[in-house]
């Protein structure tokens, strides 16, 4: 059975892991603030590149341990399915790459938990590389409504993916993070079905709102801040927002 506590009952935990959908993060900040005390470490395993700053702005960045999770899953209703044998798991580390006592404490906890994990001395680059992967592989698929095989079988789908990723790489460089040498994403047709659908398309299929604000929305804001054009991500944001409105019945006239 699950052990569920109110924020007040959980006050002062050693480690708090934040794993909510992006649209629910702002609404979770009050609870996070109530749980955290002076010694609490907070890990956000959410996608995107700004959840740590959003949380840290409320509770103080000294609490934050940068982290991300790599897991291929499929959500149906309230059920999430994944293959633990091929799941990479949690990556975490200090922003400065140091192997601090906090890193050692989390490692000690995870060693006894069965959680798959990796300690990273370059966690910010890993977070941005995953961000580029999500934008370049999640969004074209969601716009076109195709399985993963579209990237292999259509030069046009792959071109959209490449142009979206190029914008992420340019913004990352402006922020001070170089992901140019990160390998392009691909898939092994022997182990991954060309019918596979990533989370944004899964959300649209189920008529749920997506996390496109966390992907292209944040990139547009950062691009504007640093003077980097992001036209492909601007179009992707508009298209996916329009698909959300269509799913909501706002203009579906069939």
PLM ranges: what are they?
Residues 1-81:
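Rossmann-like NAD(P)(H) cofactor-binding subdomain of soluble oxidoreductases
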Residues 13, 25, 51-52, 103, ...:
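A general structural signal for well-ordered alpha-helical segments in protein cores
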Residues 162-254:
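NAD(P)-dependent Rossmann-like dehydrogenase/reductase catalytic/cofactor-binding core
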């Amino acid at each position: 059975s699950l052990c569920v506590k109110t924020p007040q009952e959980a006050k002062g935990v050693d480690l708090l892991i934040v794993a909510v959908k992006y649209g629910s993060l702002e609404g979770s900040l009050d609870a996070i603030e109530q749980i955290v005390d002076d010694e609490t470490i907070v890990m956000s395993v959410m996608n995107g590149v700004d959840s740590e700053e959003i949380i840290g702005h409320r509770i103080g960045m000294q609490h934050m341990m940068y982290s991300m999770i790599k897991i291929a899953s499929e959500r149906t209703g309230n059920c999430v399915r994944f293959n633990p044998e091929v799941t990479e798991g949690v990556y975490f580390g200090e922003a400065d790459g140091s192997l601090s006592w906090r890193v050692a404490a989390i490692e000690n906890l995870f060693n006894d938990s069965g959680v798959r994990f990796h300690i990273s001395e370059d966690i910010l680059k890993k977070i941005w590389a995953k961000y580029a992967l999500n934008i370049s592989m999640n969004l074209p698929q969601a716009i076109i409504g195709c399985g993963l095989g579209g990237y292999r079988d259509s030069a046009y789908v792959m071109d959209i993916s490449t142009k979206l990723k190029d914008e992420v790489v340019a913004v990352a460089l402006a922020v001070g993070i170089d992901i140019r040498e990160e390998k392009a994403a691909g898939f092994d047709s022997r182990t991954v079905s060309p019918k596979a659908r990533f989370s944004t398309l899964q959300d649209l299929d189920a008529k749920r709102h997506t996390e496109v604000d966390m992907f292209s929305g944040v990139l547009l804001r950062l691009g504007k801040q640093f003077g980097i054009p992001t036209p492909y991500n601007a179009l992707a944001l508009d298209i996916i927002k329009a698909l959300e409105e269509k799913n909501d019945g706002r203009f579906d006239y069939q």
